[in-house]
Regions:
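Generic low-polarity alpha-helical segments
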Residues: 13, 72-73, 99-102
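Intrinsically disordered, low-complexity sequence elements enriched in Ser/Thr/Gly/Pro
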Residues: 1-2, 67, 101, 116
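Amphipathic/hydrophobic helical signal segments and adjacent flexible N-terminal regions
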Residues: 1-32, 36, 40-42, 119-120
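Beta-sheet ligand-binding and adhesion/scaffold domains
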Residues: 22-26, 41-50, 79-120
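N-terminal glycine/threonine-rich, aromatic-flanked beta-hairpin/loop signature
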Residues: 43-81
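Conserved glycine-centered beta-strand/turn positions repeated across beta-sheet architectures
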Residues: 35, 61, 100-104
Length: 120
C-alpha cells in the first residue's frame, strides 16, 4: 500500500509542473498578432517593453529606457518568425485561460529574448 501511494505521489509531482504551461498555438496568419502587447525584453538586463503589431505583421517596440525597434512577423514553413532592425529569430504564441502570450527568441543569443502579454 505504501509503495502504491509513493508511486502515485511521484507521478503527481512529475506531471504537475506541466499543468502550468500553456501549449503553443499554431499561428496561421500574422493578423492573429495584431494589437498592443506589454511585457519584458531581456538583452543584458530585463526591462519593461511595449509593442504594437499591425495586421500585416509589422511592429514597433520600445523599452522604458527608450530603446526602440521596428520589425515584421512572418510565417516560414509554417513557423512564426520575426525580423527586426536589431535581430531576427523565432516567435511563439500561447493562450492560457484567455491570456495570450507572445515569446520572441533571437537566433543570435547575444540579442536575448522578449515575452509579451496582449493588452488589447
Amino acid at each position: 500500500m505504501k509503495r502504491k501511494l509513493a508511486l502515485l505521489l511521484a507521478v503527481l509531482f512529475a506531471v504537475s509542473p506541466l499543468a502550468g504551461f500553456a501549449a503553443d498555438k499554431q499561428v496561421k496568419d500574422v493578423k492573429e498578432l495584431a494589437g498592443s502587447w506589454q511585457g519584458w525584453a531581456t538583452e543584458q538586463t530585463q526591462e519593461r517593453a511595449n509593442m504594437v503589431v499591425q495586421a500585416d505583421g509589422k511592429y514597433k517596440a520600445s523599452t522604458t529606457r527608450g530603446l526602440t525597434t521596428e520589425g515584421q512577423f512572418y510565417l516560414q514553413d509554417g513557423k512564426l518568425r520575426y525580423r527586426s532592425s536589431r535581430s531576427e529569430g523565432t516567435a511563439s504564441l500561447s493562450d492560457d485561460k484567455g491570456k495570450a502570450t507572445l515569446r520572441m527568441t533571437a537566433d543570435n543569443p547575444d540579442y536575448g529574448k522578449a515575452e509579451y502579454e496582449r493588452i488589447r
